[in-house]
Amino acid sequence: AEEVLLLARRTDLRRISLDTPDFTDIILQIDNIRHAIAIDYDPVEGYIYWTDDDVRAIRRAYLDGSGAQTLVTTEINHPDGIAVDWVARNLYWTDTGTDRIEVTRLNGTSRKILISENLDEPRAIVLNPVMGYMYWTDWGESPKIECAYLDGSERRVLVNTSLGWPNGLALDLEKDKLYWGDAKTDKIE
């Protein structure tokens, strides 16, 4: 299988092949992308999912641009981070407008608010579906990185010192390491 990097670049989504020496990026042929913030991929069905802050929606399409659908448009203000649970077939997202973390089935049904208290500016979200955890950043007045079980229970703070605007997360499942990018300190840790 081809290794690719998916990129949400405001008004378009791109895929960059990591199998070619020049890392050429290809713009995905999907209409009406106004302000894409985050993107994730479901390796089971082959859909990409993204948040669009301008149209206040969560959408999906196949990598070739076909099958584009809008999944969530109600009670959504500033959808930000997005993460696919490829095991249980769920979709998680953060909303910096409603200050919530929510989940729905991958087809947009069975929506549920998981966390709505003590969130200031929730941004990035990543999952470890095998172990049953979610991790997210909050870059509000007291910036922090937190985790909880995928059902929102057993919430705890992992990092709350030396952070400015933690807004990117990556999880290395093999090495069990969490990496974050900070837009204020310009660091990746």
Which role does the model predict for each range below?
Residues 1-28, 48:
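An edge-strand/N-cap motif at the start of beta-rich repeat modules
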Residues 2-3, 44-46, 87-89, 130-132, ...:
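Short coil/turn segments that connect the beta-strands within blades of beta-propeller domains
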Residues 7, 49-50, 92-93, 135-137, ...:
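Residue position within the beta-strands of beta-propeller blades
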Residues 8-10, 44, 53, 96, ...:
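Short loop/turn segments immediately following the C-termini of beta-strands
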Residues 18-21, 62-66, 105-109, 149-153:
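Short loop/turn segments that connect beta-strands within beta-propeller blades
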Residues 27-32, 71-75, 114-119, 158-163:
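Surface loop/turn motifs at the tips and blade-to-blade linkers of beta-strand repeat domains
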Residues 35, 54, 78, 97, ...:
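Beta-rich catalytic cores
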Residues 39-41, 82-84, 125, 169-171:
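Hydrophobic core register within WD40 beta-propeller blades
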